[in-house]
Amino acid sequence: MVSKPHGGKLVERVAKGKTRERLVEEAKEMVNVQVDEGLAADVANVAHGVYSPLEGFMVREDYLSVLEFMRLSNDLPWTIPIILDVDENVKKSVREGDEVAIFFKGKPIAILYVEEIFPWDKNYHTLKVFKTDDLNHPGVRKVFNKKDYLLGGPLIQISDVPEPFEKYRLWPKETRVLFEQKGWKRVAAFQTRNVPHLGHEYVQKAALTFTDGLFVNPLVGWKKPGDFRDEVIIKAYEALIEHYYPKDSVAFSVLRMEMRYAGPREAVHHAIVRKNFGATHFIVGRDHAGVGNYYGPYEAWDIFKNFPDLGITPLFVREAFYCKKCGGMVNEKICPHPEEYRIRISGTKLRKMIMEGKRPPEYMMRPEVAEVVLSFEDPFVH
């Protein structure tokens, strides 16, 4: 059986038909809150059940509970606050019980039923979520650029958020049907924001060995400068899957969600989201969702000990490297040879090669994947 949604029920908050038309008209008369791409993605993810059991943006009780205990106020595991920030003007013009229109790029996308408006302490927030308030951390910097009040309450989506990669996107309702159709009972999900190298392939295939299917689910959306652009990641995975994966054992879909770079907490968040898609297992990488040296390499593994009730099984697959003596990709558990035989695949090293227009060697990256990446004039975010 694919996993049950987090909290037991898949949330759906999308207006349809006549109701939708009426709400779009009404939204034009409401106080409106303009949101950026990341918040528009959060709206869609709430509405389509990616963030089940959340039905909107967090009210104070849930928000503080998540910061302090990594659980919602009903004790369900949840590690990343899903919040809507607004300025003083909105605060003055809105009361609890009001309806507010959420606008993205000049178009109303949702209506929020305001339950609470409250100030937040950004310092406390960053220390809890990121374990640092250092402004060099991209997630911290983003928080300090946000507005001073939070609006909490349930929402209903009233028009689609444009998605440039629509043909690659499946919502939880759809992946659950897909996994059932394929007859998969055990599904391993893989989260990524990178183009695939042989280390990723090794980890994915190790997970696939003892599950029925692999769900590759890269994030698209805001990333820090130096990360790969979305279309490069998608095309690179298409090439890898086409040439090196058994088609009936892999499902591929993109997820529009911002990277927070919150390390251990974000690893748990990524697992919960994939549970909502129907995955039963989640591959947790070394320094998962980390950035710089803010988190220890295996901190993202340790945090899962706090959540025996998570409802999705974390898979801690050791980092793979190429061993010249073994003649292939291995990990520390199965390779007896000393360090001088081991070639570790570092993302930094790979990015540097690609930046210089060099083709990575075949023990690092499949030639078909390298071909795709090098075909882009500029594969990186700036």
From Swiss-Prot:
InterPro entries named in the record: ATP-Sase_PUA-like_dom, PUA-like_sf, Rossmann-like_a/b/a_fold, SO4_adenylyltransferase_pro, Sulfurylase_cat_dom, Sulphate_adenylyltransferase
SUPFAM superfamilies: Nucleotidylyl transferase (SSF52374), PUA domain-like (SSF88697)
Gene name per UniProt: sat
EC number: 2.7.7.4
Pathway: Sulfur metabolism; hydrogen sulfide biosynthesis; sulfite from sulfate: step 1/3
Family: Belongs to the sulfate adenylyltransferase family.
Gene Ontology terms for molecular function: ATP binding; sulfate adenylyltransferase (ATP) activity
Keyword Cell membrane: no
Reactions catalysed according to its record: sulfate + ATP + H(+) = adenosine 5'-phosphosulfate + diphosphate
GO biological process, one term: sulfate assimilation
Cross-referenced PANTHER family: PTHR43509, SULFATE ADENYLYLTRANSFERASE
UniProt KW ATP-binding keyword: yes
Pfam families attached to this UniProt entry: ATP-sulfurylase (PF01747), PUA_2 (PF14306)
Annotated protein name in UniProt: Sulfate adenylyltransferase
Keywords in alphabetical order: ATP-binding, Nucleotide-binding, Nucleotidyltransferase, Transferase
Enzyme class: transferase
